[in-house]
């Protein structure tokens, strides 16, 4: 390899093609420098024809070097000859509206050979031939030195310019040539601008890879190029720079992340070199490979489920890219392995790195979305490029029968986007696959069983499994279930089942919930419950305990409660050393522990004593406190209200306070007042035969039937029921023959409907229906109801 024609500019976003054989660092003399802004590969210029071959240089002076820096390639190409200034004939100019660059240097390419992947021009005749993707115009400008400049605009698709015997530039479909101040720029544009924007909007799947150092391109005569980790170059360059390994990690990032597409440097002490590549720097010390993280996002929600050619990407995939050169021995071994890999795989698919990991072998129709040409990169596992997940053919699985809930949100571009929300934590995902993968973070919900056995801790999702399990319990006799749980009383046949059951009680105790006694609020922390009580229930319970937050209505209740926290026990048993904070607990203690020893009991408070003297002394306490003596008996009360209640309830047999509506009597006016309030809003029904009133009409009908039917001379021989008239008895006898007939006791009305009969008695034989029909005596509440009745049932009689 000729080092004189080698120029590597690792941080410049352009490419230069040198046509001289001199050192590339001197850009003067007879030379033409072609600046390529994006990915364009130009090889040696040989003869009058422009031919394309697969990056195999016929001239050893031609070298192609690619530097992958934000998808920009730098190349320096030597050309053998250049024409004299007098032979330079014309310049093709494309304004900035096409590719934002100009060409002003007059260039004449006479004898050059350009490979297939290079977009170049050929000077052939006096006519200008432009392909359909190049926009040209007929505008002609003649310079001072006699050269003709062809100005190309956006508006004209194709034009022919006839001048002196000049040459013409044939521009490829993939290249637009522009005019600039010092150098001819060949700019590659794989997609038209309009189509580029459309494609960018249709699909946003991308994988961004950024390297800080130059890579190496291997030339293959039949295929594209591969970026390989091993090389046949000497281990160190002339300037003393030694090779370096960059390990690039590819992660599937969350689409909600803000830093998608970036790279993150990892400290050199953290990563592990899985492939055992040890590199020496200039001081012969081992250098740990640097690592970079590259994030990927897949935004097409339909891609994962529908596209079967899409390769599944592992969660953590990385590839090693060697920058510089490697040891010759290691490079030779790697080259042999690479050739073996190429023999095994007869057809290699090369595609831009931006799509290689994300689309697997689906390379048809894939173009760069952001308008830049990416380096063709083949990721080869055997060549040491990393642990990329193997593309194994997947079996076609049955579609998931579960229904996933979807939601529609507004995406970053302002268009509606269908997402799959997680029903547990609320996160949203752009495909069902991402949601399924995310659901693994909620194992407690995935493993939750629907059916639980009531006799043991067995759980299952299948009803038939639970049924079979319950059948096994039936086979086990009750005698075998001798082990009982101390906490809940369940029985188990063996100690192992009991131990598993007790673990449930421990888990419940660890997750104990503190519930508010005044509402349904509950929490696992006592402090949160205290704050809830202070914030919500402090108005109803103004006296709050400062220790636990419990509220009370009266200070005495709070004082009694505070004894729990202070440990104060003022009440002591007189028969033993038992002490209590509450007097009621002391009474309970005495009744349960000392009742047999003390047979004498107080009639008032039911306290027991060991002898009669203690009972008499205790009775004096009750007599001193009760100063209100009843005049009718020996009863004493502590206050006058208790004495009044005693007199009314014991010594008053009559009820002086009577209700005006129903004549019910009460001892006290307060009781009568409550009773009268019950009558409000209710209409009273008056019996027509007596002064009986009742709010319930059905009760009134029962009153009439039971009270006002005593004179019944005609009785039935079968049921001994009496009737006032003989025709009523005849109607009654029909009931014994079959269907029951209800006969009104006040009129000749009879019916077989019990509810109709009750309505008849209420509406006809009560005073609550003042408006009565003149023909049938049926009563109505309003005159309009009576008129409607007459028009419906007595129409012929009512008409004059």
Curated annotation (Swiss-Prot):
<feature type="zinc finger region" description="C2H2-type 9">
    <location>
        <begin position="657"/>
        <end position="679"/>
    </location>
</feature>
<dbReference type="GO" id="GO:0000978">
    <property type="term" value="F:RNA polymerase II cis-regulatory region sequence-specific DNA binding"/>
</dbReference>
<dbReference type="GO" id="GO:0000981">
    <property type="term" value="F:DNA-binding transcription factor activity, RNA polymerase II-specific"/>
</dbReference>
<feature type="zinc finger region" description="C2H2-type 4">
    <location>
        <begin position="514"/>
        <end position="537"/>
    </location>
</feature>
<dbReference type="GO" id="GO:0006355">
    <property type="term" value="P:regulation of DNA-templated transcription"/>
</dbReference>
<keyword id="KW-0238">DNA-binding</keyword>
<feature type="zinc finger region" description="C2H2-type 11">
    <location>
        <begin position="714"/>
        <end position="736"/>
    </location>
</feature>
<feature type="zinc finger region" description="C2H2-type 10">
    <location>
        <begin position="685"/>
        <end position="708"/>
    </location>
</feature>
<keyword id="KW-0863">Zinc-finger</keyword>
<keyword id="KW-0805">Transcription regulation</keyword>
<feature type="modified residue" description="Phosphoserine">
    <location>
        <position position="269"/>
    </location>
</feature>
<keyword id="KW-0862">Zinc</keyword>
<dbReference type="GO" id="GO:0001228">
    <property type="term" value="F:DNA-binding transcription activator activity, RNA polymerase II-specific"/>
</dbReference>
<keyword id="KW-0677">Repeat</keyword>
<dbReference type="InterPro" id="IPR036236">
    <property type="entry name" value="Znf_C2H2_sf"/>
</dbReference>
<dbReference type="Pfam" id="PF13909">
    <property type="entry name" value="zf-H2C2_5"/>
</dbReference>
<feature type="zinc finger region" description="C2H2-type 7">
    <location>
        <begin position="600"/>
        <end position="622"/>
    </location>
</feature>
<dbReference type="Pfam" id="PF00096">
    <property type="entry name" value="zf-C2H2"/>
</dbReference>
<dbReference type="Pfam" id="PF04704">
    <property type="entry name" value="Zfx_Zfy_act"/>
</dbReference>
<keyword id="KW-0479">Metal-binding</keyword>
<keyword id="KW-0010">Activator</keyword>
<keyword id="KW-0804">Transcription</keyword>
<feature type="zinc finger region" description="C2H2-type 12">
    <location>
        <begin position="742"/>
        <end position="765"/>
    </location>
</feature>
<feature type="zinc finger region" description="C2H2-type 6">
    <location>
        <begin position="571"/>
        <end position="594"/>
    </location>
</feature>
<keyword id="KW-0597">Phosphoprotein</keyword>
<dbReference type="InterPro" id="IPR013087">
    <property type="entry name" value="Znf_C2H2_type"/>
</dbReference>
<dbReference type="InterPro" id="IPR006794">
    <property type="entry name" value="Transcrp_activ_Zfx/Zfy-dom"/>
</dbReference>
<comment type="similarity">
    <text>Belongs to the krueppel C2H2-type zinc-finger protein family. ZFX/ZFY subfamily.</text>
</comment>
<keyword id="KW-0539">Nucleus</keyword>
<feature type="zinc finger region" description="C2H2-type 13">
    <location>
        <begin position="771"/>
        <end position="794"/>
    </location>
</feature>
<feature type="zinc finger region" description="C2H2-type 3">
    <location>
        <begin position="483"/>
        <end position="505"/>
    </location>
</feature>
<comment type="function">
    <text>Probable transcriptional activator.</text>
</comment>
<feature type="zinc finger region" description="C2H2-type 5">
    <location>
        <begin position="543"/>
        <end position="565"/>
    </location>
</feature>
<feature type="zinc finger region" description="C2H2-type 1">
    <location>
        <begin position="420"/>
        <end position="442"/>
    </location>
</feature>
<dbReference type="GO" id="GO:0005634">
    <property type="term" value="C:nucleus"/>
</dbReference>
<feature type="zinc finger region" description="C2H2-type 8">
    <location>
        <begin position="628"/>
        <end position="651"/>
    </location>
</feature>
<dbReference type="GO" id="GO:0008270">
    <property type="term" value="F:zinc ion binding"/>
</dbReference>
<protein>
    <recommendedName>
        <fullName>Zinc finger X-chromosomal protein</fullName>
    </recommendedName>
</protein>
<dbReference type="InterPro" id="IPR050752">
    <property type="entry name" value="C2H2-ZF_domain"/>
</dbReference>
<feature type="zinc finger region" description="C2H2-type 2">
    <location>
        <begin position="451"/>
        <end position="473"/>
    </location>
</feature>
């Amino acid at each position: 390899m000729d080092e004189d024609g080698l120029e590597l500019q690792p941080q410049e976003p352009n490419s230069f093609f040198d046509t001289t054989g001199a050192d590339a660092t001197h850009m003067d003399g007879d030379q033409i420098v072609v600046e390529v802004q994006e990915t364009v590969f130009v090889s040696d210029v040989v003869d009058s024809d422009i031919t394309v071959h697969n990056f195999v240089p016929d001239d050893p002076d031609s070298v192609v070097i690619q530097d992958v820096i934000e998808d920009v390639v730098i190349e320096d190409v030597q050309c053998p000859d250049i024409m004299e200034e007098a032979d330079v004939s014309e310049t093709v100019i494309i304004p900035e509206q096409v590719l934002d660059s100009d060409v002003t240097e007059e260039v004449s390419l006479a004898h050059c050979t350009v490979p297939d992947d290079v977009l170049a021009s050929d000077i052939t005749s006096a006519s200008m031939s432009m392909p359909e993707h190049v926009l040209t115009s007929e505008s002609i400008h003649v310079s001072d030195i006699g050269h003709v400049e062809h100005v190309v605009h956006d508006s004209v698709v194709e034009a022919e310019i006839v001048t002196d015997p000049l040459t013409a530039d044939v521009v490829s479909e993939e290249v637009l040539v522009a005019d600039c101040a010092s150098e001819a720029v060949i700019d590659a544009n794989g997609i038209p601008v309009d189509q580029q924007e459309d494609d960018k909007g249709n699909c946003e799947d991308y994988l961004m890879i950024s390297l800080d150092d130059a890579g190496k391109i291997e030339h293959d005569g039949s295929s594209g190029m591969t970026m390989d980790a091993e090389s046949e170059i000497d281990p160190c360059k002339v300037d003393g720079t030694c090779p370096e390994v960059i390990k690039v990690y590819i992660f599937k990032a969350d689409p909600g992340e803000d830093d998608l597409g970036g790279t993150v440097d990892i400290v050199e002490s953290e990563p592990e070199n899985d492939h055992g590549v040890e590199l020496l720097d200039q001081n012969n010390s081992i250098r740990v490979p640097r690592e970079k993280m590259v994030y990927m996002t897949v935004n097409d929600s339909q891609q994962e489920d529908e596209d079967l050619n899409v390769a599944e990407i592992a969660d953590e995939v990385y590839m090693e890219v060697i920058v510089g050169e490697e040891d010759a021995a290691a490079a030779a071994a790697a080259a042999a392995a690479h050739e073996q890999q190429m023999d095994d795989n007869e057809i290699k698919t090369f595609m831009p790195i931006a799509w290689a990991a994300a689309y697997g072998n689906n390379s048809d129709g894939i173009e760069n979305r952001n308008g830049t040409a990416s380096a063709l990169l083949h990721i080869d596992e055997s060549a040491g490029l990393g642990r990329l997940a193997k593309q194994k053919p997947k079996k076609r699985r049955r579609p998931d029968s579960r229904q996933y809930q979807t939601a529609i949100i507004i995406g970053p571009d302002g268009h509606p986007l269908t997402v799959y929300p997680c029903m547990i934590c609320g996160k949203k995902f752009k495909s069902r696959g991402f949601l399924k993968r995310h659901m693994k973070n909620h194992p407690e919900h995935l493993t939750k069983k629907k059916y639980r056995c009531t006799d043991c801790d067995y759980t299952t999702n299948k009803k038939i499994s639970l049924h079979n399990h319950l059948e096994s319990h039936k086979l086990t006799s009750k005698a075998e279930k001798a082990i009982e749980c101390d906490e809940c009383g369940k029985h188990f046949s063996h100690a192992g089942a009991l131990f598993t059951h007790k673990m449930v009680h421990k888990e419940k105790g660890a997750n104990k919930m503190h519930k508010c006694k005044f509402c349904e609020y509950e929490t696992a922390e006592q402090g949160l419950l205290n704050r809830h009580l202070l914030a919500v229930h402090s108005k109803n319970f103004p006296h709050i305990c400062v220790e636990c937050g419990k509220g009370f209505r009266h200070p005495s209740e709070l004082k009694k409660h505070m004894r729990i926290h202070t440990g104060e026990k003022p009440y002591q048993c007189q028969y033993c050393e038992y002490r209590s904070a509450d007097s009621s607990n002391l009474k309970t203690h005495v009744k349960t522990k000392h009742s047999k020893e003390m047979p004498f009991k107080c009639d008032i408070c039911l306290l027991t004593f060991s002898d009669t003297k203690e009972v008499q002394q205790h009775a004096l306490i009750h007599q001193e406190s009760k100063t209100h003596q009843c005049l009718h008996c020996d009863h004493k009360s502590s206050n006058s209200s208790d004495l009044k209640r005693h007199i009314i309830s014991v010594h008053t047999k009559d009820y002086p306070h009577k209700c005006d509506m129903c004549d019910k009597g009460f001892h006290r006016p307060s009781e009568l007042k409550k009773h009268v309030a019950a009558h409000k809003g209710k209409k009273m029904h008056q019996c027509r035969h007596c002064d009986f009133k009742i709010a319930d009409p059905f009760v009134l009908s029962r009153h009439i039937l039971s009270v006002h039917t005593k004179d019944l001379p005609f009785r039935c021989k079968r049921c001994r029921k009496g009737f006032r008239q003989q025709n009523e008895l005849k109607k009654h006898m029909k009931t014994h023959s079959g269907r029951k007939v209800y006969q009104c006791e006040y009129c000749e009305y009879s019916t077989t409907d019990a509810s109709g009969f009750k309505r008849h008695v209420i509406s006809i034989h009560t005073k609550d229906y003042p408006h009565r029909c003149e023909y049938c005596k049926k009563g109505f509440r309003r005159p309009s109801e009576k008129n409607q009745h007459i028009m419906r049932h007595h129409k012929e009689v009512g008409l004059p």
